[in-house]
Amino acid sequence: MMENNRNYFIAIALSVLIVLGWQFLYMNPRIEAQRKAQEAQKAQQQTEQVQQPAAGGATPAPASGTAPSGQAVATATLEQALAKTPRVAIDTPALSGSINLAGARLDDLKLKGYHETVDDSSPIITLFSPAETKDGYFTELGYIGSDATGSVPGASTLWTAPEGAKLTEKTPVTLSYTNDKGLTFTRTISVDERYMFTIADKVANTGQAPVSLSSYGRVTRYNKPTTPSAYVLHEGFIGVIGDDGLIESKYTAVEKEAVMPAKSTGGWLGITDKYWAATIVPPQASAYEARFSHFSDGQPRYQADYKDDAFTVAPGQSVELKNLVFAGAKEVPVIDGYEASYSIPRFDRLIDWGWFYFITKPMFKLMDFFFRFFGNFGVAILCTTIVVKALFFPLASKQYASMANMKRMQPKMEELKAKFGDDRMGLQQATMQLYKEEKINPIAGCWPVALQIPIFFSLYKVIYITIEMRHAPFFGWIQDLSAPDPTTIVNLFGLLPFTAPTFLHLGVWPLIMGVTMFLQMRMNPTPPDPTQAMIFNWMPLVFMFMLASFPAGLVIYWAWNNTLSVIQQSVIMKRHGVKIELFDNLKGLFRRKTAPSK
């Protein structure tokens, strides 16, 4: 049968099997192992060492500082940690939590709009936790002074706040601290309706001599996330810093060596997870040194921090600084809005769109358009697939036209094979001459394949990384498009009282995908080569099991794409007068072979 068509499926198979094999053989066992470890960890009470903030406002290891040794204490529960220090409540439509007046830290933050599971009664997502807890995670801004400045705000500085103060999207909170050298620090914290905090500081010198000091900011995380990371997206340190541009560093890389970009002006830095992130946007007009680092004193600590150049405050004068802190969900419209409204360079790269950024992000935009119209991301995936198919229809038409021409040439090709026999060189030259006479480009059918592969990976990226897909339902039993199909045929979809092993997990949608792939491959004659025929016969079954562990949204896309491909190929082949082989192939597949007569 037509060589181009065989190459089509082989190219798709080889490209996709890389991702499928990695997911099936590497990620699934890793996820299962970490899930069991997490359960065991919750069942066991542990006493661990954590680092206590240094007293007296000492520098908490900013870009050019030294990590304090601290005092080891037993890990506290969240309730115990919150009760240790005075706090100012945070309550907005998207966030709840509190500001720790010791250090003015953002170390208690929950995301109201997101739950841990699809069950709305499950706990909401906790982003920040105090340093004393096992999984401490927080942001902090402070100063580095000298003997002349006296004690400046640091990790343990106790700020004062008005009685009854509460931070909401409409009511900022003003904190203050005055030291014995006549320096008064005033910090006004405001937050919008989503996830951006604006922290405006004013340093006033009421003393008799000028003083010089520097400011710093840091995002600190104790321990790595408990959820397994994936090579398909970046999790860890991230930032856009001066001439270095976008910097992405994995936790394991920073454990080996700290990352210290060149001193720069502008940009941002922080720590990102799959769906959540915490970043600091330093004062954009000041030069600063940034660093991604890891400390193992006490409890493992990962830190993204910066320290700016020293500034001088003359007697009777004041200096104002402004930092932005993003802490929340990586919602695409919100991130894009912050990039535009605050002029934050390349802030949209906080979402890992991947190498095919120029395809992946527009594809999400198209999908989001359909979601806003239909209110269902599953339907949006179906509509996006139709649009992509329509855009590629001219290329697909050329591909099948080339295939039709190749099929009409089959009798002549057979004559050449019979004529040249084992003379491969002569056969190749005669074949190329035949192509030239018939004005046929034998590789014309490859371009649609080459263009569709980035489309597939881009769609996979959209479904896998965007928080909009998280817990997004389709219809029926699919309540989370970003998770695998929860049903499994092995236990008759729950009728039999046992849980199937991960490698045998085969849901309804993977089964549908396998059937549609089988039908698509039967649109063309069976390859004469036995090896290729065997590959074609087994490919739908292999893909069916391997895709079972992929997000349901991707499997639905693939099943729908196969269905549209069958329809599209039928239309195009009919237009070019090429016989549709589907029904003949199905009849031939199920027709019993008769024994040869003696």
Curated annotation (Swiss-Prot):
Source organism superkingdom: Bacteria
Gene3D superfamilies given in the database record: 2.70.98.90
Molecular function GO labels: membrane insertase activity
The entry's keywords: Cell inner membrane, Cell membrane, Chaperone, Membrane, Protein transport, Transmembrane, Transmembrane helix, Transport
Main subcellular location: membrane
Quaternary structure, from the entry: Interacts with the Sec translocase complex via SecD. Specifically interacts with transmembrane segments of nascent integral membrane proteins during membrane integration.
Function, in words: Required for the insertion and/or proper folding and/or complex formation of integral membrane proteins into the membrane. Involved in integration of membrane proteins that insert both dependently and independently of the Sec translocase complex, as well as at least some lipoproteins. Aids folding of multispanning membrane proteins.
Protein name: Membrane protein insertase YidC
Species assigned in the record: Rhizobium etli (strain CIAT 652)
